[in-house]
């Protein structure tokens, strides 16, 4: 928190104005000074509100692909999540090559397109550590210095600074995950990030799935004192709606450990569905698109301010490799059905916020009431087989938009409208006078 408050800024401005002449030049200078003071006072850029599509994002694996960024922006995504790899930046002790490693170009490209960034500060560095982890005091100091240098270089852009990726599994923290060493790393790194970038937010621990006992032990070691938001990766073979009970349990756990007066938001930092599901079942492109739209909608309903879909595009073309089929686009950046579903959701409900879930009589049927000013919309779908439901739209003309953007005009003369509901979300927009 800056000691210079907005009230102090107003007092300073008043003194400047009283001592200056009333020339146009002086007024302009005063205006610029006042703006700079207020900018300094604002502090961290907040998490986005729960308005479509302000918190929608995708994971990426590139540093300088302008055409990909154009497609991402065109789909309505407002965030990207990307590794800011320690070993790529610091190849010689104490020398940070952000430009040569491509991060300057990526940051500039995102900023130009109005895309916010979640940078994952990861992984280890052979200059200091022998494995994919940070276990020594020397390594922690070096990692914290690298992180602070990154925050200083890209300060002022409201970046979410994430400390490591999935430290709770052996793949990313070797030889074995260590709550003790991970929490020590966060404690060593977070203060420097906040000092170097007052507009940024520190987020962690980016866990694989939602490991409640692991999180409980981290919270017990003080993790929530050092971070601004909690990131988890709610992967599951089941449909997205099953996350509701997990978020409820996680919130209760957070509330039992959060410092008094501190609000810790949950961020869905990585979550997607490959065409080869976790239980080895196969999904069609349409099912993947359905799950994408439903994931974003469920996260909004659950007050999750940032939702990152994994992945922007396929990481390869092997038909039997799960990792090659998470994308909203193919390996050569050709849009898949998931991309069209994301673009339709973002454009159709742009500016809308979820107000409540409507009761359709079955737990498997979902209908979310959304609002944008005086405009109303209902997003509705089911987790089971197609059937008909009755929606409370009232006498009105409306537009019904499909998962992929096909629209039909409807006229309802009664209080309710009966429509087919399927596993593909549809958007019913009531026309206003």
List PLM regions with ranges.
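C-terminal beta-strand-rich structural cap/linker in extracellular carbohydrate-active enzymes
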Residues: 411-433
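Noncatalytic carbohydrate-binding groove/subsite architecture in carbohydrate-active enzymes
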Residues: 179-293, 302
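Substrate-binding cleft and catalytic face of glycoside hydrolase catalytic domains
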Residues: 69, 75-95, 102-225, 235
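Aromatic/acidic polysaccharide-binding cleft in carbohydrate-active enzymes
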Residues: 279-342
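Bacterial N-terminal signal peptides
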Residues: 28-39
């Amino acid at each position: 928190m800056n000691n210079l408050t907005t009230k102090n800024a107003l007092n300073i401005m008043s003194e400047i104005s009283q001592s200056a002449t009333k020339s146009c030049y002086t007024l302009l200078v005063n205006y610029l000074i006042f703006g700079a003071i207020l900018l300094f006072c604002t502090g961290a850029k907040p998490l986005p509100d729960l308005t479509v599509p302000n918190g929608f994002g995708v994971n990426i694996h590139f540093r300088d692909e302008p055409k990909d960024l154009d497609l991402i922006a065109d789909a309505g995504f407002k965030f990207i999540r990307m590794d800011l790899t320690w070993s790529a930046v610091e190849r010689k002790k104490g020398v940070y090559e952000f430009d040569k490693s491509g991060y300057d170009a990526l940051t500039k490209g995102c900023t130009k397109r109005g895309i916010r960034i979640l940078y994952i500060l990861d992984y280890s560095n052979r200059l200091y550590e022998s494995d994919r982890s940070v276990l020594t005091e020397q390594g922690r100091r070096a990692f914290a210095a690298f992180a602070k240098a990154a925050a200083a270089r890209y300060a002022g852009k409201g970046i979410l600074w994430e400390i490591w990726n999935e430290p709770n599994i052996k793949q990313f923290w070797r030889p074995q995950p260590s709550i003790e060493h991970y929490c020590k790393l966060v404690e060593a790194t977070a203060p420097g990030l906040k000092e170097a970038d007052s507009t940024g937010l520190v987020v962690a621990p980016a866990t694989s799935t939602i490991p409640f006992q692991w999180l409980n032990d981290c919270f017990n070691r003080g993790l929530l004192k050092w971070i601004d938001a909690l990131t988890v990766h709610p992967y599951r073979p089941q449909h997205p709606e099953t996350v509701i009970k997990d978020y409820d349990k996680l919130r209760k756990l957070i509330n039992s450990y959060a410092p008094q007066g501190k609000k810790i938001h949950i961020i869905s930092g990585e979550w997607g569905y490959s065409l080869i599901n976790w239980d080895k079942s196969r999904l069609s492109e349409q099912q993947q698109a359905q799950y994408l739209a439903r994931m974003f909608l469920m996260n909004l309903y659950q007050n999750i301010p940032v939702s990152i879909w994994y992945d922007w595009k396929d990481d390869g073309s092997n038909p039997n490799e799960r990792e090659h089929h998470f994308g909203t686009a193919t390996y050569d950046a050709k849009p898949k059905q998931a991309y069209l579903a994301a673009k339709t959701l973002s454009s159709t409900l742009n500016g809308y916020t979820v107000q409540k879930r409507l009761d359709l009589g079955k737990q498997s049927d979902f209908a979310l009431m959304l609002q944008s000013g005086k405009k109303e919309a209902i997003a509705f779908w089911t987790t089971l087989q197609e059937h008909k439901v009755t929606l409370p739209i009232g006498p009105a003309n409306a537009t019904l938009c499909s998962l992929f953007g096909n629209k039909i005009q409807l006229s309802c003369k009664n209080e309710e409208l009966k429509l087919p509901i399927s596993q593909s979300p549809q958007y019913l927009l009531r026309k206003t006078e």
